[in-house]
């Protein structure tokens, strides 16, 4: 069980990701999916997932941290899940992401976060939609054959 932590409107400066994640790491909290969105106003939103049981601790660390660099709102969203499609050669198969996102959209499952690598596409969804998402992707990619 995971939580999503969003740190909004922090300065978009070199090293901001390290400033955010260093105290989280020092507290022994593992971070999973990370997304950073830079706005046109020189600020950034920084979002990541952690295990539910450590989410309150992580949010408190960030609230204390934001006071040190002048702003930033911390939002904690509990009960999210990561669902992934994994396969060697994912990068060379065009359309896998669109197919994945389409299958979820057809089931009215909203995607909160997206992370990709050469062999995996992961999405973060509401925990109560995770099982339905897994079934939708299983059906879409015909994994029972």
State where each predicted segment sits.
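A conserved regulatory-domain signal marking ACT and ACT-like small-molecule sensing domains
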Residues: 1-145
